[in-house]
Regions:
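Alpha-helical adaptor scaffolds
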Residues: 24, 43-88
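Amphipathic alpha-helical segments of tetratricopeptide repeats
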Residues: 36-42, 76-83, 116-122
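Boundary/linker segments of alpha-helical solenoid repeat arrays
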Residues: 45-49, 84-90, 119-132
């Protein structure tokens, strides 16, 4: 992993913070456009940048909050793209995969993903999430 130049990182952070403000204002479409803009600012290959993973997770979290599964899948794939190179957040990625599978109604795959997370990291990834995910997991164990 290479560290981004400070000025570029500050520019990306500003775009990401604006995306978050747009989300808080209820404008998911504009929010996602700014997340996309932040993503496009990373030099290729984007999977070399730890910060690119952060941009993707911010976007996927906004998509989950809005139950926008189509866009969540795009950003989840980007999280995986970066993580496949850096291998830093396997449990976090698996937890988000479980949430996506749950929301898509693929409950067997959701349970499998959540079970892997719990075996790797315990239940800490459920702490700041809607209780439906942990309740689902506990109900299947």
């Amino acid at each position: 992993m290479v560290i981004l130049e400070n000025t570029l990182q500050a520019e990306i952070d500003a775009v990401s913070m604006h995306a978050h403000r747009l989300y808080n204002a209820g404008d998911l479409q504009s929010c996602l456009e700014f997340h996309e803009r932040a993503w496009s600012m990373y030099p290729e290959p984007r999977n070399n940048w730890n910060e690119a993973y952060n941009t993707a997770i911010y976007a996927v979290d906004d998509c989950f909050s809005a139950l926008d599964m189509k866009n969540a899948k795009t950003w989840l794939d980007r999280m995986a793209y970066v993580n496949d190179q850096l291998h830093q957040r396997d449990e976090e990625l698996m937890h988000h995969t479980g949430k996506y599978k749950y929301e898509m109604g693929d409950y067997d795959a959701a349970f499998t993903a959540f079970d892997k997370v719990v075996k790797m990291a315990g239940k800490r990834y459920f702490e700041d999430e809607p209780s439906k995910y942990l309740n689902f997991y506990i109900g299947r164990t």
